[in-house]
Amino acid sequence: MESSDVELDFQRSVQAVLRELNTPNPALQSNQGMWRWSLHKKVERNPGKSSILVRILLRELEKAESEDGRRVIIPLLLTLMSVLTKATGIPEDLYHRAYTFCTRLLTLPAPYSTVALDCAIRLKTETAVPGTLYQRTVIAEQNLISELYPYQERVFLFVDPELVSASVCSALLLEIQAAQEQQTPEACMRHVVSHALQAALGEACHTGALNRKLQASSRRVLEYYFHAVVAAIEQVASEDSPSRLGHLEKMEEIYCSLLGPATTRRHCVGDLLQDRLPSIPLPSPYITFHLWTDQEQLWKELVLFLRPRSQLRLSADLDALDLQGFRLDRDLARVSTDSGIERDLPLGSDELPDPSSSEMERAALQRKGGIKKRVWPPDFFMPGSWDGPPGLHRRTGRPSGDGELLPGVSRVHTARVLVLGDDRMLGRLAQAYYRLRKRETKKFCLTPRLSLQLYYIPVLAPQVTGQDPEASRKPELGELASFLGRVDPWYESTVNTLCPAILKLAEMPPYLDTSRTVDPFILDVITYYVRMGTQPIYFQLYKVKIFTSLSHDPTEDIFLTELKVKIQDSKSPKEGSSPRRRGAAEGTGAELSMCYQKALLSHRPREVTVSLRATGLVLKAIPAGDTEVSGFFHCTSPNAASATDCSCLHVSVTEVVKSSNLAGRSFTTSTNTFRTSSIQVQSQDQRLLTLWLDKDGRRTFRDVVRFEVSPCPEPCSRTQKSKTSALNSHGQETEKNMAKPNSLLMPINTFSGIIQ
């Protein structure tokens, strides 16, 4: 195909992606997302034409910038970065052009400036040292051993077998296994060596002879050249002013050593013309498939992810921790019971210095510390400290927050937890996330070495043919997915459209032959999402205290999307009560007393207490429309706003209204709505309540007389509590400031975050 034909084909595909992004057509929802995938496949089949697609994408980006078409900037920019990560032979002027464009976006508000900064950092490294992005991505995602680049990533795919059908689970598992059986460590190392040499040498690289040599090499030889290539790239990339010429000389030495001088001398123009540039695939990440059947399964899998790398040097403090985390927690403080005078310690004590040391020559009286506490960074308990400083996001192949929370301990592991399902699955994820954060306050095990990233792909039950869509989808189980699609158009086009393809895959007969190359659409979309979805949206978790008796302690639980309340069937009236005094309305609903803090735009506290008769109420934490998205409901950074700024419940109460007319009394129902950050509800008569959390029938609480809902606070450690009590002795003002904990926010990664 001629270059003009290829350019025209690429141009049509890019325009189709933009049309789908700007004017989504619900009638073609089953085919949405295919244009982006087919565009990437065209480049993979003809990698020598990658520079043509790069020019087209840059032209469309500059056009969108001039016409203020911000809706398409982030999708085009992420598509460009995906192409540049895989491609070789891109002219240097295109890298500089892309880098300059990203620097201009830094003047725009978030999320454009945030995504542009992330892309600019990667482009600067790739321009100086071609092949860096590809190499780091493969090493991290495939868990290849490298001392110079020790970062490791893993994708944990969690599916609840009670919410997702067995056919969907088996179809996904077979597709993942079929792709990963072709991604052996030897194949990945061959890809890294071949890509690095082609990216550095360009047309001077004899690709045919290189690939034949790599295929014939033993594992020992392959590992030798793999480590040589990694060392050459990482050493140059770590320099303050990388020299592209020096990098080229090192890669030429490796190339000549691998092929030998005789082969390199025979490399002539005729060989170059006959040697078509081969496609070097970028392997999909290492994915593990899990059926979520245990409440502690997420914690256990994360701990097992860290254990194989136990040879990494850790601080003495972390070495003392129990990595499994299943034994009793050790105390964070050691309280001395002696007099505090070193001379009074008994002989043989472990705290006595060696007699030959110089410490014995010091004064006989020395104070010993009465309390020895472990000191953590002041903000590591906050959600932002799990992912590094706010505003700094992950680079490809390197997990976010890759600095050191503790001296000598680097966060070289990234766990990408991907859940499939509906809102009920997200409620289960919220429970696991809360338990994990609470456990970390007692045993600081995962946080210093692990960057946790959460992803969500909606998988909803198919609609019944011939049934009303509204009737077949009650209760609505995809509210959070709809919200993510409204605030992030690229998430809507890429991820929300994946559900029909997954259901279609489950209906197809299984293909058990894994020997031939597969071209999996679903796995490719998952790979694109976990690589490019770096911008989190933080959701407020809510704690609910449930009382079945006012004289007993409440049961506590959390929810993410919804709490639904129904009135249970009425019990028999108490003896002595007069049936004559029971009106018609006595059998409808229950008398409820509600006390809530009304949410106002001014954020001024206003407490409201009201009593009414109602048949039920619903508390929703997800905004229903675009007008509510642009308000103060959600925030894209855990430190961007206070809890009152980014937490708001939408309460709908079905109230029983009594009216009188000439025909007599009549009772109707009306729905009242209001917004609040916390609420307390108590039944005033003999009617009991039933609560459903996150639309999950397994999380049902019956015979409830009272419940209280408020933003879930960040779990607090004993160290923080002792610090708070110490500060309280200095004054009441300090106590007031320290008593209010921060709210616990759960991040879900998207492509752009919230676009206002």
Curated annotation (Swiss-Prot):
Q: Tissue-wise, where is it found?
A: Highly expressed in heart. In a lower extent, also expressed in brain, spleen, lung, liver, kidney, prostate, thyroid, salivary gland, dendritic cells, macrophages and neutrophils.
Q: Which GO terms describe its cellular component?
A: cytoplasm; membrane; phosphatidylinositol 3-kinase complex, class IB; plasma membrane
Q: What is its main location?
A: cytoplasm
Location in the cell reads: Cytoplasm; Cell membrane
Q: How does it sit in the membrane?
A: Peripheral membrane protein
A single BP term in Gene Ontology: positive regulation of T cell differentiation
The Gene Ontology terms for molecular function here are: 1-phosphatidylinositol-3-kinase regulator activity
Q: Disordered: where is this region?
A: 570-589, 716-738
Kindly give the Pfam families that the UniProt entry links to this protein: PI3K_1B_p101 (PF10486)
Polar residues: which segments have biased composition? 717-731
Xref: InterPro entries: PIK3R5/6
Coiled-coil parts of chain: none
Keywords for this protein: Angiogenesis, Cell membrane, Cytoplasm, Membrane
Question: PANTHER family recorded for this chain?
Answer: PHOSPHATIDYLINOSITOL 3-KINASE REGULATORY SUBUNIT (PTHR15593), PHOSPHOINOSITIDE 3-KINASE REGULATORY SUBUNIT 6 (PTHR15593:SF1)
Role summary: Regulatory subunit of the PI3K gamma complex. Acts as an adapter to drive activation of PIK3CG by beta-gamma G protein dimers. The PIK3CG:PIK3R6 heterodimer is much less sensitive to beta-gamma G proteins than PIK3CG:PIK3R5 and its membrane recruitment and beta-gamma G protein dimer-dependent activation requires HRAS bound to PIK3CG. Recruits of the PI3K gamma complex to a PDE3B:RAPGEF3 signaling complex involved in angiogenesis; signaling seems to involve RRAS.
Q: How is the subunit organization of this protein annotated in UniProt?
A: Heterodimer of a catalytic subunit (PIK3CG) and a regulatory (PIK3R6) subunit. The binding of PIK3R6 to PIK3CG may exclude the binding of PIK3R5 to PIK3CG. Interacts with beta-gamma G protein dimers. Interacts with PDE3B and RAPGEF3; form a signaling complex that regulates phosphatidylinositol 3-kinase gamma in angiogenesis.
- What name has this protein been given in UniProt? Phosphoinositide 3-kinase regulatory subunit 6
* Species per Swiss-Prot/TrEMBL record: Mus musculus
